[in-house]
């Protein structure tokens, strides 16, 4: 007889009672929502300071309730549905984009597995659940979120959202390859895909020190994955009006914005877990304070690291301009993927040497990391060198402006002139020709005037 699912061994998901699992799930949801509300206000404040402005200062103390006011405003706005839209897919797209953004936090550890805290008299770990393949789960969930953006662009029945959805699909596919290679190097060095085990393996040195190239690659790819500046091509208002969410309003638009900021928090939490020691206290504190990694303190260190990475997102938005789409694809396919593959091979080689008890493995890893960082900088320098050569090249004569090149007339842009319009030759003076021909004598006077009677 086939056993039921309830009879299977589900101990890998934890041994907490169902009500405690619900409490921890609600805590994870509340953590994401509070962090998002704070991050929106923090972003507007930081960008305002960069631009010598005040920023939000009306709702709540120091404008801290501005995000809540914006959310209520969006919920009370009129919800419009485009007539040409595929209504079922149009409504489901924001949900498909928002739900996967919340799911990845389930396997992120907020504290050590052996440091159980007491919740209503029950001892439990500071993590919703831990899986042996937790990082593969995060990759799978992150890949599902792209469907919401693509479906939103396709179902809107408009050109601009469709182009934004296609851009987002191509961008995320391009950058997930390099992200997967960065993850693989961490798996090779830690020997596990479990998030709690990866944090435990960083007890002496964080992976940002051992795997610096993987950290740089992941930082670049996480900005591309979240469609944030300077890689926010799917929603560039300069050429796509509003991008994939142009035709959305009210609560549906708010769900897309919520998904974007929740993704920022999620990728920052993943980066903290993989490269920054997770919940572990920073190096100076952990050396003289033994209790820094016990109790509720690990959650404080984790939140501080996540907030620093969120500030990095904000700093990028306030300082860097949006790159062109061809530059974005060139960076992903010609720089990040080759560097990540070479670095992964080097990490695998060093890991093999360490298993054979070679002493120079760490030295080779550091040297290889430095070499790849130099290669990455050389790639970026080549890009700027080509741009400077193009700027220094003598300007060619611009092609003549053709107002009908696109099939319909368009006005000239500044600096363009309309070509001269061909005119007919001026008409010659007409000669008076009588009906009988030029050789026929006319009955009238020679000057063409009629004779009078007197």
Swiss-Prot record:
One GO CC term on file: plasma membrane
EC number: 7.1.1.-
Domain of life: Bacteria
Record's bilayer topology term: Multi-pass membrane protein
InterPro entries linked: NADH_UbQ_OxRdtase_su1/FPO, NADH_UbQ_OxRdtase_su1_CS
Compartments where found: Cell membrane
Keywords: Cell membrane, Membrane, NAD, Quinone, Translocase, Transmembrane, Transmembrane helix, Ubiquinone
The protein's name in its UniProt record: NADH-quinone oxidoreductase subunit H
Upper classification of the organism: Bacteria, Bacillati, Actinomycetota, Actinomycetes, Kitasatosporales
């Amino acid at each position: 007889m086939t056993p039921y699912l309830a009879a299977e061994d589900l101990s890998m998901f934890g041994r907490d009672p169902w009500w405690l699992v619900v409490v921890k799930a609600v805590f994870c949801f509340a953590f994401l929502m509070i962090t998002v509300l704070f991050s929106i206000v923090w972003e507007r404040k930081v960008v305002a300071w960069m631009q010598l402005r005040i920023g939000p200062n009306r709702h709540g103390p120091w404008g801290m309730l501005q995000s809540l006011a914006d959310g209520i405003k969006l919920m009370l706005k009129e919800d419009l549905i485009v007539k040409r839209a595929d209504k079922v897919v149009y409504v489901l797209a924001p949900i498909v984009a928002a739900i996967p953004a919340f799911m990845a936090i389930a396997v992120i550890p907020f504290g050590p597995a052996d440091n159980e805290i007491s919740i209503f008299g029950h001892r439990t770990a500071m993590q919703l659940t831990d899986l042996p393949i937790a990082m593969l789960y995060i990759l799978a969930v992150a890949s599902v979120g792209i469907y919401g953006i693509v479906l939103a662009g396709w179902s809107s029945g408009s050109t601009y959202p469709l182009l934004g959805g296609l851009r987002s699909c191509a961008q995320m596919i391009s950058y997930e390859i390099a992200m997967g290679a960065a993850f693989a190097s961490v798996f090779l060095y830690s020997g596990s895909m479990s998030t709690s085990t990866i944090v435990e393996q960083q007890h002496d040195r964080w992976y940002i020190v051992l795997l610096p190239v993987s950290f740089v690659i992941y930082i670049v790819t996480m900005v591309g994955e979240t469609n944030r500046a300077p890689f926010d091509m799917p929603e560039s208002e300069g050429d796509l009006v509003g991008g994939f969410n142009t035709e959305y309003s009210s609560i549906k638009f708010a769900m897309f914005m919520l998904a974007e900021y929740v993704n920022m928090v999620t990728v920052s939490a993943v980066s903290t877990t993989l490269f920054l020691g997770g919940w572990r206290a920073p190096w100076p504190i952990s050396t003289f304070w033994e209790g820094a990694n016990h109790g509720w303190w690990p959650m404080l260190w984790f939140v501080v690291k996540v907030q620093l990475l969120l500030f990095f997102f904000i700093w990028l938005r306030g300082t860097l301009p949006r790159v062109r789409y061809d530059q974005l694809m060139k960076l992903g396919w010609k720089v990040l993927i080759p560097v990540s593959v070479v670095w992964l091979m080097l990490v695998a080689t060093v890991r093999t040497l360490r298993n054979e008890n070679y002493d120079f493995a760490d030295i080779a890893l550091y040297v290889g990391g430095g070499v790849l960082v130099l290669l990455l900088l050389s790639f970026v320098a080549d890009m700027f060198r080509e741009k400077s050569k193009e700027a220094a090249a003598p300007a060619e004569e611009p092609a003549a402006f053709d107002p009908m090149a696109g099939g319909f007339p368009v006005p000239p842009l500044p600096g363009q002139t309309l070509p001269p319009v061909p005119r007919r030759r001026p008409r010659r003076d007409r000669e008076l020709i009588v009906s009988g021909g030029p050789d026929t004598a006319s009955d009238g006077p020679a000057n063409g005037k009629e004779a009078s009677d007197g």
